[in-house]
Amino acid sequence: KGLDVLIRAMRLLGPRYRLIIAGEPYGSFEKYDELISESGDSSRFFIYPQYIRDSEVKKYFCAADLTVLPYKSATQSGISAVSNHFEKPMVVTDVGGLKETIGDRGTGIVCKKCTPECVAEAIENYFDHPERKEEFVSNIRKENERLSWNRFCKNLTEFINTLNAK
């Protein structure tokens, strides 16, 4: 998932940055604990390495300003849909369909490379330009409306009506 890249990116970011790591890891979390220890300031990391129940997801997203998905490989990510639900802009790497669902829709920043430097730069870019948050959140709201059940039902009803008219 690229968590190692994000932890290394935190080393490059100033002390004002904090990172919430939430969710059940694939395999042992030991290697990430080591990277966090090597970062020099483990107090900047808030770690919840367990399965997150649906009823608990909200508190993690409400505590966050930004969702970062530094994936090394992926086709899509369910986390991006959850992030949109909570109107959180994203920093993602250019893998799978993330560029199309995030970058092309203007709901976040796409890193050209999955490196700590690129991820750190994108995170800083987001926080150094607060006006971008408004733009991203506005685009997320439009995307949420486009993908809403209300829109789906409206389109389906219109389609059925065209069939009935024939």
Each language-model region and where it sits:
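Conserved acidic donor-binding segment of nucleotide-sugar-dependent glycosyltransferases
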Residues: 104-105, 109-116, 125-131
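Acidic donor-binding loop of glycosyltransferase active sites
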Residues: 59-75, 88
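Glycosyltransferase donor-sugar binding loop
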Residues: 18-32, 50
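A short, well-ordered alpha-helix in the C-terminal region of glycosyltransferases
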Residues: 132-146
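A conserved mid-protein helix/loop that constitutes part of the nucleotide-sugar donor-binding site
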Residues: 1-12, 81, 117
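C-terminal alpha-helical cap of glycosyltransferases
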Residues: 125, 129, 146-166
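Nucleotide-activated donor-binding/catalytic signature segment of Leloir-type glycosyltransferases, i.e.
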Residues: 32-58
